[in-house]
């Protein structure tokens, strides 16, 4: 059989030999002995006979259906299987399956000269990649168009790119060798939309999604196709699109990331900065997928609004008092007292010049020219004292939201003493922000960026009068700008707390107590907040007592310590005489004026317990709650139940005395769990046994307690009397000042009966207390 060739040549990469080649030439070039070739020829004939007798299926029998072609991807080795001298067809255009008829005689393998050899799949792909322009036979009618190498293979077989636009692509833009993926078949079988032209699929991008041409899914619903960077849809489960945005994944989806929250085209930070809400904004809109309520719903339902990240700081709520007059607003005795207190009409604040009308919305403000329904005291009658919960007050408050004039008579208090010092949330009118003056109307910031002090609740800035008098040009004031309210506070509770602190501090007229002047609203100190509540008070440029102890403790002597202790006792005695307990005495809340005078400040934790001068009620008064710092808290505050806040202030004064001398605390906490406090209680009991009722020392030796044993002898007595573990046995501030050795202390500060007589105004008599001339100047001055 001269036309036969060895079986091991089938599937090799060598080109076919023509029939004209002689057997001698083939035998010479072959490396296999003749007997072996003869045996292999017998095996080849047996193989061909079984194939022709239908024992071995022809390659056409292995063709799969259209559904199997989409699911089971074919390879080049399957595409190049020869069949009946017919050109290769793509799976989409394959002829219908026909029954194979076996020929009468065996057909040799090389019967067709134009037939391609059966190459292995991997070798064929590598050959196509290395030789893109190689053809099997130049004269073959089934020769393929030139391939584009590895790039074409990756684009068609892996990335499923559409290469129909390329001039070298196969006919009709389809690959004759590689079947398309399932996603490609889904997109191909979907008919294009008649309204929108089909756009080419873009390349991979970093953004999450790209809006392409609109197509229709097999069920007829309009869908937006996605880019290849997103998950490709399948025919069984296409990607769901809603208004141009991808739907949110399920909460348990692993793809739930920050990029899934974006909306529109582009990446997370590519959205335009516009005021219109987006799906990521906190306000709900008809087209957004956010479940947060809209601002209009918040305003209508009165629900509490909590600012946070990516949310507006202040909810836009409609102001019912914007274009109405004060006479048409709801009124009550408490509302009018608050309006009168913050009006500036009393001689509590420095007026300056050019302030004929501090607040046009406040009828008690100087120079108010609006319509006023205030009546004289003779015509007021009993309706002036109507309680806020009475029917008259309720009707007037309910029907005066800007619809008409009120029937409630507006009666101003005669003086500040009629205004309560401790306000409740019901005392605050709903129009409180409109009657409180603006800080910029009277004052101006000295340095808008520098903070003189900062704490958990407020920051301190410096202001001066905007239009001062000739002798007020050098005056400087401290403005305490409060931070925002807590999340669990209402507006009424927040304003009542700030107003109560201001009402207490504005009545302080003592050289050792800081006085407050104005309660204002500002929008410049905290630019992010629309309205910041501020309190204007005396300015102490030398800082607080804690800074003096830390920085200049080595320069302070015995006389300095004694003078400062006496000034603290004086200021605390005055505060207690007004029926007020401070409840937060510590070095941080004791400031130093320009001349070295110590002044107590920060009445945020104070409690109004009785009327001024009521000593009987002061002893029996009780307070509730935990206030202050742990090292300065009295032991009764740390135990459940009520306590007398006046005695708690005396305990705190004893701890401040210890800090002045030793720059440290005697113990961390006044609790039995503290070992130092347990030792102190033992030393105090031993000390009390050797002293008589008047605290006169009988024995020459004292029980050893190092934190107290190093104090001077008279200061030891004062410390044990102030820091008595039993609250009712502690001495008061007045009793401490009456001690003989305390009265002998030379103090640089003037007494409470002496004030600045040359002050510009009556309210500024205690703005900068003078000092006395001493024989030996103190180092803290």
UniProtKB/Swiss-Prot annotation:
Chief location: cytoplasm
Cysteines engaged in disulfide bonds, as pairs: none
UniProt modified residues of type Phosphoserine: 94, 253
Any one GO molecular function term: ATP binding
Sequence segments annotated as region (Disordered): 1-315, 368-417
Comp. bias regions, Polar residues: 43-63, 74-92, 136-146, 161-195, 206-228, 379-406
Subcellular location: Cytoplasm
SMART domains the record matches: S_TKc
GO-annotated biological processes: G2/M transition of mitotic cell cycle; proteasome-mediated ubiquitin-dependent protein catabolic process; signal transduction
Broadest EC class assigned to this enzyme: transferase
Positions with biased composition (Basic and acidic residues): 64-73
Compositionally skewed regions (Basic residues) per UniProt: 112-121
Compositionally biased intervals (Low complexity): 21-31, 272-304
GO CC annotations on file: cell division site; cytoplasm; cytosol; nucleus
Active site (record annotation): 584
Residues reported to bind ATP: 452-460, 480
Protein kinase domain: residues covered: 432-742
Keyword Kinase (UniProt): yes
Keyword annotations: ATP-binding, Cytoplasm, Kinase, Nucleotide-binding, Phosphoprotein, Serine/threonine-protein kinase, Transferase
EC number per UniProt: 2.7.11.1
Reaction it catalyzes: L-seryl-[protein] + ATP = O-phospho-L-seryl-[protein] + ADP + H(+); L-threonyl-[protein] + ATP = O-phospho-L-threonyl-[protein] + ADP + H(+)
InterPro entries xref list: Kinase-like_dom_sf, Prot_kinase_dom, Ser/Thr_kinase_AS
Family note: Belongs to the protein kinase superfamily. Ser/Thr protein kinase family.
Name of this protein: Probable serine/threonine-protein kinase C70.05c
């Amino acid at each position: 059989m001269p036309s036969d060739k060895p079986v091991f040549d089938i599937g090799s990469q060598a080109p076919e030999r023509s029939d004209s080649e002689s057997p001698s030439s083939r035998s010479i070039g072959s490396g296999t002995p003749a007997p072996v070739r003869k045996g292999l020829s017998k095996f080849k004939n047996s193989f061909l006979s079984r194939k022709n007798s239908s024992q071995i299926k022809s390659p056409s029998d292995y063709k799969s259906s259209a559904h199997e072609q989409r699911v089971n991807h074919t390879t080049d080795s399957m595409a190049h299987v020869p069949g009946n001298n017919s050109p290769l067809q793509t799976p989409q255009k394959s002829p219908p399956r026909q029954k194979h008829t076996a020929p009468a005689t065996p057909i040799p393998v090389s019967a067709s000269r134009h037939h391609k050899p059966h190459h292995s799949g991997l070798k064929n792909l590598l050959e196509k990649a290395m030789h893109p322009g190689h053809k099997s036979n130049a004269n073959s009618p089934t020769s393929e168009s030139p391939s584009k190498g590895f790039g074409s293979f990756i684009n068609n077989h892996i990335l499923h790119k559409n290469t129909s636009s390329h001039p070298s692509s196969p006919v009709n833009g389809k690959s004759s060798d590689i079947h398309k993926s399932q996603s490609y078949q889904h997109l191909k079988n979907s008919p294009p939309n008649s309204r929108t032209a089909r756009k080419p699929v873009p390349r991979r991008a970093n953004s999450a999604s790209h809006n392409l041409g609109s197509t229709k899914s097999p069920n007829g619903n309009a869908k937006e196709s996605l880019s290849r960077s997103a998950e490709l849809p399948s025919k069984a489960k296409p990607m769901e699109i809603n208004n141009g945005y991808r739907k949110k994944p399920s909460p348990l989806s692993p793809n739930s990331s920050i990029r899934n929250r974006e909306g529109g085209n582009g990446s997370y930070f590519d959205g335009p900065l516009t005021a219109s809400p987006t799906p990521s904004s906190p306000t709900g809109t008809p087209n957004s997928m956010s479940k947060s309520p809209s601002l209009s719903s918040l305003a209508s339902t009165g629900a509490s609004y909590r600012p946070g990240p990516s949310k507006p700081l202040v909810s836009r709520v409609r102001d019912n008092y914007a274009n109405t007059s004060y006479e048409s607003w709801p009124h009550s005795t408490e509302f009018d007292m608050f309006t009168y207190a913050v009006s500036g009409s009393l001689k509590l604040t420095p007026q300056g010049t050019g302030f004929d009308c501090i607040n046009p919305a406040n009828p008690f403000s100087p120079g108010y020219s609006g319509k006023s329904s205030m009546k004289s005291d003779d015509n007021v009658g009993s309706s002036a004292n109507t309680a806020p919960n009475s029917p008259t007050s309720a009707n007037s408050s309910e029907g005066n939201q800007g619809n008409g004039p009120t029937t409630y008579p507006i009666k101003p208090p005669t003086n500040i003493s009629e205004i309560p010092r401790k306000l409740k949330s019901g005392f605050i009118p709903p129009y409180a922000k409109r009657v409180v003056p603006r800080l910029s109307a009277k004052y101006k910031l000295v340095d808008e960026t520098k903070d003189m002090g900062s704490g958990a609740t407020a920051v301190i800035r410096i202001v001066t009068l905007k239009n001062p008098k000739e002798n007020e040009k050098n005056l400087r004031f401290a403005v305490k700008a409060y931070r925002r309210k807590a999340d669990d506070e209402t507006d009424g509770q927040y304003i009542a707390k700030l107003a109560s602190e201001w009402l207490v501090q504005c009545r302080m007229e003592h050289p050792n107590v800081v006085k407050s002047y104005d309660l204002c609203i500002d929008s410049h100190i905290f630019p992010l907040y629309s309205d910041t509540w501020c309190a204007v008070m005396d300015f102490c440029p030398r800082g607080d007592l804690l800074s003096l102890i830390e920085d200049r403790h080595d320069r302070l002597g015995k006389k300095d310590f004694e003078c400062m202790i006496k000034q603290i006792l004086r200021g605390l005695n005055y505060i207690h005489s007004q029926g007020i307990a401070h409840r937060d005495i510590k070095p941080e809340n004791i400031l130093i004026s320009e001349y070295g005078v110590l002044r107590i400040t920060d009445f945020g934790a104070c409690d109004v317990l009785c009327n001024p001068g009521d000593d009987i009620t002061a002893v029996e008064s009780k307070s509730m709650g935990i206030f202050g710092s742990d090292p300065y808290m009295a032991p009764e505050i740390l135990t459940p139940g009520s306590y007398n806040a006046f005695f708690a202030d005396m305990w705190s004064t004893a701890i401040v005395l210890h800090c002045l001398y030793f720059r440290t605390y005697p113990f961390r906490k006044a609790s039995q769990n503290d070992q130092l406090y347990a030792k102190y209680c033992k030393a105090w009991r031993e000390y009390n046994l050797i002293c008589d009722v008047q605290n006169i020392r009988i024995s020459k030796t004292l029980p050893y307690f190092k934190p107290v044993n190093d104090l001077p002898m008279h200061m030891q007595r004062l410390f044990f009397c102030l820091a008595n573990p039993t609250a009712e046995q502690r001495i008061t501030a007045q009793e401490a000042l009456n001690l003989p050795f305390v009265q002998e202390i030379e103090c640089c500060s003037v007494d409470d009966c002496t004030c600045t007589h040359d002050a510009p105004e009556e309210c500024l008599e205690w703005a900068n207390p003078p000092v006395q001339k001493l024989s030996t100047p103190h180092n803290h001055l």
